[in-house]
Amino acid sequence: MQTDATLDVNLTRALNESKRLADQTTPASDRWDVIVVGSGAAGGMASFQLAMAGVKVLMLDAGRMIDERTEYRTMEWPYASMRRHRLPPGERPIAVAEYNFVDRPYGANRLYEKSQKVLSYAGNSFTRNWVVDERQHPTTGTPYAWVRARVLGGKTNFWGRGALRYGPLQFNAASRDGFDVDWPISYDDVKPYYDKVDVLLGCAGTKEGLLQVPDGVFQRSSKLNCVEVAFKRAIAKMGRHYIPGRAGVTTEGVLNTKYRARCAGRGRCGRGCNIGAAFHSPTALVYPARDSGNLTIRPYSIVSEVLVGKESNRAIGVRVIDANTREVMDFKAPIVVLGAGTLDTTRILLNSKSAAHPNGLGNSSGLLGCHLSEHIMGIRGSGYMPVRIGTETTLDDGRPVSPYIPRFRNITDKHPDFIRGYHFQGGGGCGEYPGMAHEIPGYGKAFKSNVRKYYPAIISFGGFGEVLPRKENRVMLDPDVRDAWGIPVLRFDYRFGDNELKMAKDMADSIEEMLHEAHAEDIKIEREPLPPGWSIHEIGTARMGDDPKTSVTDKFCRLHDVKNVYIADAAPFVSGARRTPPGRSSRWRGGRPIS
């Protein structure tokens, strides 16, 4: 019988290392200057910056260590899995429609009672050992596709690698359209740290001089293929841009690291890059920080709350539940940095209740958990470009990100139906597999001929629209439901508003308009948004500001109420954009007052 590579990933080395580190790291085993919760982009950058500055750091991660040489299956052939990389029997992901129509908690629903493991939509044969089991990690409330990973590096092990900067349009959005408030910092404040991150970690792209997507310090980018060049020329007549994607990938190499090599153009980055070209927190940040001798990593450490001392405005450490033994331990340090991800960080703070902080730590404003924001997604379109119909197939695969159509709404003009904006990502040409074959009718020789005919000509795009940061979009603790470790879970109260739905309609109309302008054939448009949370870009639940009455953190991401607790993830972000959050640069800037 054929060997199923999906089930043959040997985790022995990672599991043994995880147990060793957890066993040897106790509250009494050392003294640390800073505790950092989380090991992904947020916790990784905070730990790296502090450790390199000579600060003794304890990194607490809820998951296990990772063996990237074994678990990053970049070079696995498609035929190595009998199920085309779908989950094995007994495990299943939550389907798109199930997020909206299945009663919550998802993992506890009768629909999944025969499943041994229930994963989010991001669960597949490559991520199944990283993403959480929804039965152990339930959530309640309105539908929300919350993707979580419990392994060293978190979601950076399979992120989308888009590395786009926020700019003045984002930091000063409220001044432009009158909705909500501006950030307490500007693009000029953050730009030097964007530049530092680009140099340290590598960012591939092209300089375009566009206000809506500021340029960075770029390495060599991927090129547009024939289909994409034809599309670019067509929409240029409409005043719109189509540029190579900007990727958190080193194509020319980075200095001072033995864990990363330059991109080899293999294109399977979502499985984890086993040469370290794509940014992953372990190889880019955590291992170099550990090599400094200043970083201690303790896996299997579920932080349930931040502890406050007799002085109610000072934290003294965190409470940890060992993921395996269930032992409860209190780790102490003068400073605590939360980088568990926007929603998990918020959950920890909400659960950090005391006589002095009855509604959670840092919640004197009552805004902790409010202003949840992300991207509205699912609007997409496709067609076939005449220039490539019936031509020979070419090698168009291997790029770390797809090309990008920057925002073109509400920049110099004002749309009558909505504020803020959106962008598209997508491309064309011959990928690893002709997925469009599923939509070509017929069978036999004629079917195969048509697949070959249209395979080189496909082009498709998906939209990302900004969700406005509304106070009523929020999370809170559910007093009646707990996770497998006895910690109250999050209850969501989150919905797309009128602005997002009108924006989504314009997205669909715009992509149809552009495909027609490019004379594409057999145009198909999907107008239905995906469930909330699909973008994995949640931000804003501990927003920053100068006034403690209207914000949770200051402009350095430090709690107004407790001056020695910092947030390293996207929870302090005031508003979003039509792109991924400016995470690593803000973490670098936010760490300066500590080091």
Where are these regions (language model features)?
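Residue-level detector of alpha-helix initiation sites
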Residues: G40-A41, S222, L343, P572
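Conserved redox-cofactor binding core of oxidoreductases
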Residues: Q2-T6, R83-A145, R150-V151, K155-Q170, ...
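N-terminal Rossmann-like FAD-binding beta1-loop-alpha1 element of flavoenzymes
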Residues: V34-M59
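A conserved FAD-binding loop/helix module that cradles the flavin
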Residues: S575-P593
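Glycine-rich loop(s) and the adjacent beta-strand/alpha-helix scaffold that form part
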Residues: M52, K56, A62-P89, S292, ...
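A glycine-rich dinucleotide-binding beta-alpha-beta segment and adjacent secondary-structure elements
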Residues: R31, P244-G248, R262-C269, S304-L307, ...
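Extreme N-terminal leader/targeting segments of oxidoreductases
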Residues: M1-V34, M52-A53, D67-H85, P89-E91, ...
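FAD cofactor-binding and catalytic pocket of flavoenzymes
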Residues: S120-R148, L152-K155, W183-Y187, S365-L490, ...
